């Protein structure tokens, strides 16, 4: 249950920020345009939310969702796993890839490009998301130490296949907002 909380709560907050405060051209908003009744409520909710937009710092709209996404990604890879060290390495590689991608935006990106626009705060929030979930997951891993005799080749293969699925799902979730 707590794993689900650490995955879904930050993910929903991040998607909610995109939905309420980002461009109407982004994918998460376009989902609601297919149904007129839902769309009318969505517009009303966005209009109300925009009244409060001026009270939020820019980083809360543009950088925080990135950190929340990485935090959720880490939660799904690190919490309640037999092979914590392996998953930690995989997650660290993903974090390094995301920071590298952000630096590539500095040289090859820009407003309106598929790569996006470089922002130091994105790197900060990726780092915060990475650090917080690593600390939380490490604490939970030590607290709930799985019994070694429960580990088998089957459980290792199962965790690895889950990792592949989760990496694909979170990659899609991370790319969708910028595709449309």
Q: PLM features: residue spans?
A:
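Bulky hydrophobic segments
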Residues: 1-180
């Amino acid at each position: 249950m707590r794993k689900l909380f650490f995955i879904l709560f930050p993910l929903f907050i991040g998607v909610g920020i995109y939905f309420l405060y980002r461009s109407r051209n982004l994918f998460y908003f376009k989902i609601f345009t297919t149904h007129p009744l839902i769309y009318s409520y969505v517009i009303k909710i966005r209009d109300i939310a925009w009244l409060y937009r001026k009270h939020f710092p820019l980083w809360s709209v543009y950088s925080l969702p990135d950190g929340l996404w990485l935090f959720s990604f880490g939660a799904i890879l690190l919490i309640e796993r037999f092979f914590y060290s392996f998953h930690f390495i995989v997650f660290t590689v993903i974090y390094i890839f995301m920071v590298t991608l952000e630096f590539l935006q500095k040289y090859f990106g820009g407003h309106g490009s598929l790569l996006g626009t470089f922002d130091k705060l994105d790197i900060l929030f990726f780092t915060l998301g990475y650090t917080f979930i690593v600390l939380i997951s490490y604490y939970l891993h030590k607290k709930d130490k799985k019994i070694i005799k429960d580990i088998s080749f089957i459980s290792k293969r199962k965790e690895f296949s889950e990792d592949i699925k989760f990496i694909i799902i979170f990659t899609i979730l991370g790319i969708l907002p910028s595709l449309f």
